[in-house]
Amino acid sequence: SPPVCGNKILEQGEDCDCGSPANCQDRCCNAATCKLTPGSQCNYGECCDQCRFKKAGTVCRIARGDWNDDYCTGKSSDCPWNH
């Protein structure tokens, strides 16, 4: 079935889905189009801060055991596994 903008479920073709325009609390997401607002790079993720990717080298996951710290790439909102 085609994606439904406004159902709070991120579906194919949508950048974001924060619900209806009346209920959306996400300034990074255009609730009417389910696309990021102008100037926004992201709306969630360990490497997203105020609609922008965190700088490359920002720690996003602290080392545990034999694993090293994980760092943001500056190009994605996801925190990659760097070990």
UniProtKB/Swiss-Prot annotation:
SS bonds (residue pairs): 5-24, 5-34, 16-29, 16-34, 18-24, 18-29, 28-51, 42-48, 47-72, 60-79
Keywords from the UniProt entry: Cell adhesion impairing toxin, Disulfide bond, Hemostasis impairing toxin, Platelet aggregation inhibiting toxin, Secreted, Toxin
Major site of localization recorded for this protein: secreted
Signal peptide from the UniProt entry: none
Subunit (UniProt): Monomer.
PTM per Swiss-Prot/TrEMBL: Exists in 3 forms in the venom. The forms A, B, and C are present at 53%, 32% and 15%. The forms A and B differ by their disulfide bond pattern in the N-terminal part. No information is known about form C.
Tissue expression summary: Expressed by the venom gland.
The name this protein goes by in its record: Disintegrin bitistatin
Function summary: Inhibits fibrinogen interaction with platelets. Acts by binding to alpha-IIb/beta-3 (ITGA2B/ITGB3) on the platelet surface and inhibits aggregation induced by ADP, thrombin, platelet-activating factor and collagen.
Motif range (Cell attachment site): 64-66
Ranges for domain Disintegrin: 2-83
UniProt-listed Gene3D superfamilies: Disintegrin domain (4.10.70.10)
PANTHER family: ADAM A DISINTEGRIN AND METALLOPROTEASE DOMAIN (PTHR11905), DISINTEGRIN AND METALLOPROTEINASE DOMAIN-CONTAINING PROTEIN 28 (PTHR11905:SF32)
Extra remark beyond the main annotation: The disintegrin belongs to the long disintegrin subfamily.
Record's subcellular location: Secreted
Family as reported in the entry's similarity comment: Belongs to the venom metalloproteinase (M12B) family. P-II subfamily. P-IIa sub-subfamily.
GO cellular component annotations of the record: extracellular region; plasma membrane
Molecular functions per Gene Ontology: toxin activity
